[in-house]
Amino acid sequence: LVLANYPNKDGRLANGVGLDTPASAVHVMTLLLEAHYDVQELPANSAALMAQIMAGPTNWLTDRAERSGGETLPLVDYLAQYQTLPYALRTRIEERWGDPSSDPFFEPTTATAVGGFKLSILRFGNISLGLQPARGYNIDPTETYHSPDLVPPHNYLAFYFWLRNSQGAHAVVHLGKHGNLEWLPGKALALSEECLPEAILGPMPHIYPFIVNDPGEGTQAKRRTQAVIIDHLTPPLTRAETYGPLRDLEALVDEYYEAAGIDPRRINYLRREILTLTATSGLDKDIGFQGEEAGDLAKLDAYLCDLKEAQIRDGLHIFGQTPEGQQLRDLTIALARIPRGNGKGGDASLLRAMADDLQLAFDPLDCDLSVQWEGPTPPSLACLSDDVWRSNGDTVERLELLAQHLMEATAQAPGEKSSAVMAKICDSIAPTLAQCGPMEGEGLLTALAGQFVSPAPSGAPTRGRLDVLPTGRNFYSVDSRAVPTPTAWALGWKSANLLI
């Protein structure tokens, strides 16, 4: 199991986009143990795993020499494998990084140890877990991670030489988007022996758990490192809402607009309080206050409304596990929040369906949240919150709260349209979502068994692409069913007619 480390600091160990990589690594090893792989001394949890990683050598050079543990590839073994590389490739590496013994990750021979490369690798029986090396040292990692011409240093090669030959690994799993192996110099397709990904990884079976909404970079791994993708869910989403100073500001703004035209003295006091709190929190700069109190207050109100209803991540996904509890509820609502397919019947937006059933006469997905609400205030929404009901945003908030109650079966759908969407959620969306965790684990074990992993489309499930679920499959980037698009077909038809 190879974990990414970008940038190569200890504060960024085991980072993967949208993935709780340490917890995922522990869960993957648990799955391997249950599948009768030889897994020994399994860490109790992600914290225990990270403590083990931090206790040993990492990519952070500062105090590396003071850390014990890890695996060592003796220089003699390294040179034996290094000499098998094409001469032109070795020349490029040595011109950039010098000879192997000059690498800062190389430890010379001492009275008690043979000289070699100290590697960031832990062993758990037949399962090894390592930190992918950086693409170089004394360089800016943010500028070189995707560099098309920077050859890797000797310690990088030593890491993969150890996996392939010293451990004799049967497969490598790069856990989470994304590592740097697939970005090493070489051809984009049909790699040769002088292309770094091919020279380093060789014919090793390569399994790559990868976030389902990024087919572009996943395709890079497929083309350049023969990766079998096992796609995984995006992080669970929820409403941002407001808290702390933002919650205080929201209450003050609501009170301000309630007092408008009624109590001028209270308005002046509230205005000062609002502007002071905004300046203290730094929001005045974020929002772009112009020094015009009325205009600035309107900007603040719009900002708070937009922020409150924004969809944000609620934690990270753990590979092989479906979200539970509130995370599962909120993610299900996020999947049904926007229309899917033709946007009709069960594929309609849940929020729009509820708004139509309640005869609110507005679009909750496409409205100015800060505009004053002038529509009806049905009791089924009014009872859900004691907060002021003043703006479109307050109406959307109550629709979101009603959706939560519908998911928890503590309220009934307000009408025919929302009933159709809820039926689709119960019959299709929720069961499919529940399959994601188990299928991710099953997909990984299937790949490790050398068996076929089913293909699937890719994309963001929270943007209407429910066809990418369940995850745990080998995604592709271009869906042949969607090619050509109607526009492309129309233009092609016109071009053909002009040619004829």
Where are these regions (language model features)?
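Ligand/cofactor-recognition surfaces for anionic moieties
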Residues: 2-500
